[in-house]
């Protein structure tokens, strides 16, 4: 009995210990299994990706393009513009900051793994084949490297690569300035392969002609232009090394006229109006009218020089040049008009003065003759007149004295009236009407012509 009881006791204790251990293991051991499995899975993925990357570059030659000898490599491109501007008129160039995306397929980089898309470090871009894209009209291009190279590289399991770079490009923008400052321009951005002709590499737009070039809503950095929109297309050029495809994106710009109205147009208009004030001054006011004429001519000269400083030295006249030239003609004509009036005014003074001098001499002789006769008659009458005849009836009496006084008064009045030799010039009268009408008509025709017509954008090509 004792042995049986001892055996049962031992078995019971053993069973109890087993149950307790199972309970503890279920509480602690099973709770640690998920973490351990996640870590193991992560480690396995890292190991798998490492093996994939190591295997991708085994026997890979980045000197050879994908599909060499079998097919043409197609490179799909699109552009996202983060900042557009500024635009330099004098240099005929513009600056643009973009995310430049390129996508192509390289069957040598196909892989099988737990993920369909594999994000890669930008260092791998130097170890694989990438398109030799360059910008045809680029003057200066910068690839951003702060804080690390701004590049993105993604690889899909079928070998499709997405390569994105952030670039700042200064590109040429040919401008036709005949309509300046009411002009519009299409600034192109042209890029393509440097070495591969169409028989080896072709470029296409990723999202067609409408969405392949997108400008951010707050991406415009323009003070003198409105960014009206953008269009894309393709061009083909033939050289001695083959035929190449050029991808083109045109950014359509319309100039803002407000700055030039304040800076040039209003001062020119006010100067012309000021020059016409001289028509209302007396033609005898030679200093005042001379100051008006010379000052306005010098002002127009200064305005014409300053207006040209913001433009390149083109060989043709712009719309602003025509306006300034006409205003200059009006101002100079006002000065010539004054010179003409002044010339005839001097001649009028000379002839009127000569006639007045001759008339004064004749009147003086007549007056002396009359006075002599009156004095002699008065003296004779005083000595010999009959006593019954009043003095008023005698020749040379008081009546004659009154007549002589009236003659003198009329002569003085005549001489006073002769002092004003010149009336208002007929040329001035005509100029007061003709000059404002002509200048107003010119402004009406000028602004109606340039503001109401559609802007002519030269250099833009229709999308293909």
Curated annotation (Swiss-Prot):
For whether the record's keyword set contains Transferase, the answer is no
Q: Keywords in UniProt for this one?
A: Cell membrane, Chloride, Chloride channel, Disulfide bond, Glycoprotein, Ion channel, Ion transport, Isopeptide bond, Ligand-gated ion channel, Membrane, Postsynaptic cell membrane, Receptor, Signal, Synapse, Transmembrane, Transmembrane helix, Transport, Ubl conjugation
The Gene Ontology biological process terms listed for this entry are: associative learning; behavioral fear response; chemical synaptic transmission; chloride transmembrane transport; cochlea development; gamma-aminobutyric acid signaling pathway; inhibitory synapse assembly; inner ear receptor cell development
Cytoplasmic side residue ranges read 341-429
Keyword Ubl conjugation in record: yes
Tissues expressing this chain:
Expressed in brain areas such as cerebral cortex, hippocampal formation and olfactory bulb granular layer.
Q: Which InterPro entries match?
A: GABAA/Glycine_rcpt, GABAAa_rcpt, GABBAa5_rcpt, Gabra-1-6_TM, Neur_chan_lig-bd, Neur_chan_lig-bd_sf, Neur_channel, Neuro-gated_channel_TM_sf
Gene Ontology molecular-function annotations: chloride channel activity; GABA receptor binding; GABA-A receptor activity; GABA-gated chloride ion channel activity; ligand-gated monoatomic ion channel activity involved in regulation of presynaptic membrane potential; transmitter-gated monoatomic ion channel activity involved in regulation of postsynaptic membrane potential
The cross-references to PROSITE patterns, in alphabetical order and at most eight, read: NEUROTR_ION_CHANNEL
User: What is the residue range of the signal peptide feature?
Assistant: 1-25
Residue ranges crossing the lipid bilayer per the database entry: 261-281, 287-308, 319-340, 430-450
Q: How does it sit in the membrane?
A: Multi-pass membrane protein
The record places the cross-link (Glycyl lysine isopeptide (Lys-Gly) (interchain with G-Cter in ubiquitin)) at 355
Residue pairs linked by disulfide bridges in the UniProt entry: 173-187
Parts of the chain on the Extracellular side: 26-260
Give me the glycosylation sites of this protein: 45, 145, 207, 236
Q: Where does 4-aminobutanoate bind?
A: 101, 164
Q: Which intervals of the chain are annotated as region Disordered? A: 382-414
What the record says about activity regulation is: Allosterically potentiated by alphaxalone. Allosterically inhibited by pregnenolone sulfate. Inhibited by zinc and lanthanum.
The text the record gives for the protein's domains is: GABAARs subunits share a common topological structure: a peptide sequence made up of a long extracellular N-terminal, four transmembrane domains, intracellular or cytoplasmic domain located between the third and the fourth transmembrane domains.
How does it associate, per the subunit comment? Heteropentamer, formed by a combination of alpha (GABRA1-6), beta (GABRB1-3), gamma (GABRG1-3), delta (GABRD), epsilon (GABRE), rho (GABRR1-3), pi (GABRP) and theta (GABRQ) chains, each subunit exhibiting distinct physiological and pharmacological properties.
State the protein's purpose: Alpha subunit of the heteropentameric ligand-gated chloride channel gated by gamma-aminobutyric acid (GABA), a major inhibitory neurotransmitter in the brain. GABA-gated chloride channels, also named GABA(A) receptors (GABAAR), consist of five subunits arranged around a central pore and contain GABA active binding site(s) located at the alpha and beta subunit interface(s). When activated by GABA, GABAARs selectively allow the flow of chloride anions across the cell membrane down their electrochemical gradient.
**What does the sequence similarity comment in the record state about its family?**
Belongs to the ligand-gated ion channel (TC 1.A.9) family. Gamma-aminobutyric acid receptor (TC 1.A.9.5) subfamily. GABRA5 sub-subfamily.
Q: What name does UniProt use for this protein?
A: Gamma-aminobutyric acid receptor subunit alpha-5
Lineage of source species: Eukaryota, Metazoa, Chordata, Craniata, Vertebrata
Gene responsible for this protein: Gabra5
């Amino acid at each position: 009995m004792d042995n049986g009881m001892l055996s049962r006791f031992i078995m019971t204790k053993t069973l109890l210990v087993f149950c307790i251990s199972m309970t503890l293991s279920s509480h602690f051991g099973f709770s640690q299994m998920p973490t351990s499995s996640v870590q193991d899975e992560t480690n396995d993925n890292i190991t798998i990706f490492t093996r994939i990357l190591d295997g991708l570059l085994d026997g890979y030659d980045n000197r050879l393009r994908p599909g060499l000898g079998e097919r043409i490599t197609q490179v799909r491109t699109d552009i996202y513009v983060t900042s557009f501007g500024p635009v330099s008129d004098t240099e005929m160039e513009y600056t643009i900051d973009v995310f430049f995306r390129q996508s192509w397929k390289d069957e040598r980089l196909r892989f099988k793994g737990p993920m369909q898309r594999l994000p890669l470090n930008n260092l791998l871009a130097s170890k694989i084949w990438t398109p030799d894209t360059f910008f045809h009209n680029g003057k200066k291009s910068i690839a951003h490297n702060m804080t690390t190279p701004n590049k993105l590289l993604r690889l899909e399991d079928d070998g499709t690569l997405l390569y994105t770079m952030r670039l700042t490009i200064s590109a040429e923008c040919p401008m036709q300035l005949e309509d300046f400052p009411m002009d519009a321009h299409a600034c192109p951005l042209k890029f393509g392969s440097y070495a591969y002709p169409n028989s080896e590499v072709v470029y296409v737009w990723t999202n067609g002609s409408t969405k392949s070039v997108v400008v951010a809503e707050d991406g415009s950095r323009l003070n003198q232009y409105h960014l009206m929109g953008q269009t894309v297309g393709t061009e083909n050029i033939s050289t001695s090394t083959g035929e190449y495809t050029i991808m083109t994106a045109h950014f359509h710009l319309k100039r803002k006229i407000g700055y030039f109205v304040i800076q040039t147009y209003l001062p020119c208009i006010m100067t012309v109006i000021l020059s016409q004030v001289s028509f209302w001054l007396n033609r005898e006011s030679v200093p005042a009218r001379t100051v008006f004429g010379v000052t306005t001519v010098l002002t127009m000269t200064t305005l014409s020089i300053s207006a040209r400083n913001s433009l390149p030295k083109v060989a043709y006249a712009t719309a602003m040049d025509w306006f300034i030239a006409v205003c200059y003609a009006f101002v100079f004509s006002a000065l010539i008009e004054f010179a003409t009036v002044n010339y005839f005014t001097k001649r009028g003074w000379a002839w009127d003065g000569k006639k007045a001098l001759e008339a004064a001499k004749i009147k003086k002789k007549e007056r002396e003759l009359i006075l002599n006769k009156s004095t002699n008659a008065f003296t004779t009458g005083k000595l010999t007149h009959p006593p019954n005849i009043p003095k008023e009836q005698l020749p040379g009496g008081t009546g004659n004295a009154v007549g002589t006084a009236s003659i003198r008064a009329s002569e003085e009045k005549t001489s006073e009236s002769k002092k004003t030799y010149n009336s208002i010039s007929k040329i001035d009268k005509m100029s007061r009407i003709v000059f404002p009408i002509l200048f107003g008509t010119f402004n009406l025709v000028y602004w109606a012509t340039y503001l109401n017509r559609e802007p002519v954008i030269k250099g833009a090509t229709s999308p293909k």
